[in-house]
C-alpha cells in the first residue's frame, strides 16, 4: 500500500496566526498586536483586522503575514487571494519564512497569481533554507515529482529528511516510502518502518496503515498480526479506508 501523493498536505489553510515576540522598542506596538491576537483567538476577526492593518502598512512583517492569512481565509474581510498574495509577498520580502512558504503555495495552486511551479519552488526553497519544515517537505515533493525543477529522488530525500528530523509527520511518512521503494536511498525496510512509526505515532493515517501492513507481511519487522490489527484500527479511526478494510479482515480471521 502506497501513500497517497498529495502535494500540499500542510498547505495554506493550516497556517496559524503568529504572536508577537516582545521587543524593548515597541511596547505600544506589542500591545496593539496582542489586542489583535486576543480578538482573533476569540473569532472577532474584524477587530483583529482593524488593529493589524495599520501595523502591516507600517511594514510590520508578522502583521502583514496575518493579514495574508485573513484574506486567504476570508476572516474579517472579503476573501481575496490577490490581497493575500500582496501581504504574503510583503512579509516574505522581509525574510518571514512562513510567508515565503504560503507564497510558494499560492504559486503552486495559482491562487491570486498565475500558476507557476518554478516560482513555487523558488519560494519553497527560500523558506526551506531557513529551516521551515513544511517548506522542506513541499520542496522534497517538487523534486520527487519533477515539478518546477528537474526530477531528482536524491534531492527529494535530502529535503524529506531535513523536515522529518524536525518532526514533520508527512515528511517522515514520505521518507519511509522512499526507503520502501529504494528511491533516492538504498532500499531498507527496517529504516522504512522506523520512519513510518514516527509518523504513525503522530496520527498520520497512511503511515499507520502502512505500519499495519509491515507487521502483517513481516516487512522490516517480525510478523505480528496483533500489532497489525492495532495499527489498522488506528488508521481506520483516522479515515484510512485501507486500514478499515484490513482491520475488518483481521477481525474476521482473514488474511
Functional labels for PLM-detected ranges:
Residues 3-6, 29, 222-223, 227-255:
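Terminal, low-structured helical/coil segments at or just beyond the last alpha-helical repeat
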Residues 27, 32, 39-44, 57-60, ...:
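Short helix-capping/linker turns of helical repeat alpha-solenoids
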Residues 31-39, 51-55, 66-73, 102-109, ...:
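Hydrophobic face of amphipathic alpha-helices that form TPR/SEL1-like repeat modules
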Residues 5-14:
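Sec-dependent N-terminal signal peptides
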Residues 15-23:
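C-terminal segment of classical bacterial N-terminal signal peptides
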Amino acid at each position: 500500500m502506497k501513500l497517497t501523493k498529495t502535494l500540499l498536505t500542510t498547505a495554506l489553510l493550516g497556517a496559524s496566526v503568529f504572536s508577537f515576540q516582545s521587543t524593548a522598542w515597541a511596547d505600544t506596538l506589542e500591545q496593539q498586536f496582542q489586542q489583535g491576537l486576543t480578538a482573533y483567538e476569540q473569532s472577532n476577526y474584524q477587530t483583529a483586522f482593524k488593529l493589524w492593518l495599520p501595523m502591516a502598512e507600517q511594514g510590520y512583517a508578522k502583521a502583514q503575514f496575518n493579514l495574508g492569512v485573513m484574506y486567504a481565509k476570508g476572516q474579517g474581510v472579503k476573501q481575496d487571494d490577490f490581497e493575500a498574495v500582496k501581504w504574503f509577498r510583503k512579509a516574505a520580502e522581509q525574510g518571514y519564512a512562513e510567508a515565503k512558504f504560503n507564497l510558494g503555495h499560492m504559486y503552486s495552486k495559482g491562487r491570486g497569481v498565475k500558476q507557476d511551479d518554478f516560482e513555487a519552488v523558488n519560494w519553497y526553497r527560500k523558506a526551506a533554507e531557513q529551516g521551515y519544515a513544511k517548506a522542506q517537505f513541499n520542496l522534497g515533493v517538487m523534486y520527487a515529482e519533477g515539478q518546477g525543477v528537474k526530477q531528482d529522488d536524491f534531492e527529494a530525500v535530502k529535503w524529506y529528511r531535513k523536515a522529518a528530523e524536525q518532526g514533520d509527520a508527512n515528511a517522515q511518512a514520505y521518507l519511509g516510502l522512499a526507503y520502501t521503494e529504494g528511491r533516492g536511498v538504498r532500499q531498507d525496510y527496517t529504516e522504512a518502518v522506523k520512519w513510518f512509526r514516527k509518523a504513525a505515532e503522530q496520527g498520520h493515517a497512511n503511515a499507520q496503515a502502512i505500519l499495519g501492513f509491515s507487521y502483517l507481511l513481516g516487512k522490516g519487522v517480525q510478523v505480528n498480526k496483533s500489532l497489525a490489527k492495532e495499527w489498522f484500527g488506528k488508521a481506520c479511526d483516522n479515515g484510512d479506508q485501507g486500514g478499515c478494510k484490513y482491520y475488518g479482515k483481521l477481525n474476521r480471521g482473514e488474511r
